[in-house]
Amino acid sequence: MKMYIPLLALAAVMAVGCGDDDDGMTGPDNSTALGFFVSSSTSATGNLGGLAGADGRCQGLAAAVGAGSRTWRAYLSTSSVNARDRIGSGPWRNANGAVVANNLTELHARTGDAALFVDERGTRINGQWSGSPSPVQHDVLTGSTADGRVMAGLTCSDWTSASASEAAQVGHSDGLGPNMSTTGSLPSWNSAHANESCANTAPRGGSGRIYCFAVN
């Protein structure tokens, strides 16, 4: 019987190895893999309930896709905090496993990209990209400059106002302007232009979406 012991041991090792391979085929665990998304939910106005309300939206959407164990923050600047200082240090992957940026410097040096700036389920945001559905919704609320700092006067009173006399700075998730233009600030994912007003996020190509980042 002793001569069979090594064979039995080898079989046990092989069985464990096969079990590990099977586990690896189940795909990434979203509780740690997902680190960035454009919110699938929208807002008709710039009143998001302040930073707390926006963060809560990010946390809820992340939880719905199995990533709620991470701490999520909205990429929004206010009079008291810059968006870049709220989102951790990276790296950040999207729902499809692609790296959006490895760190803050890389993040703020890049432009929008329809294939990377997707929602929490990996779906592209309607924009100016070829074949996009209508309506255009690539204007994402940020209230920020291109380097992630507050754009004074363009934060809808720190995301608590739906006033027609105020506006918000937005970025283009796809990095494109009309007719797929990439001139001027149009490619900016976080600071392309100001929207029409805080009373209505739809004109000019918006729907009140926000960017969400995992800070841990």
Per-segment meaning from a language model:
Residues 10-11, 209:
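Short A/G/S/P-biased low-complexity tracts
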Residues 2-9:
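Sec-dependent signal peptide recognition
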Residues 14-17:
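C-terminal motif of bacterial Sec signal peptides marking the signal peptidase cleavage site
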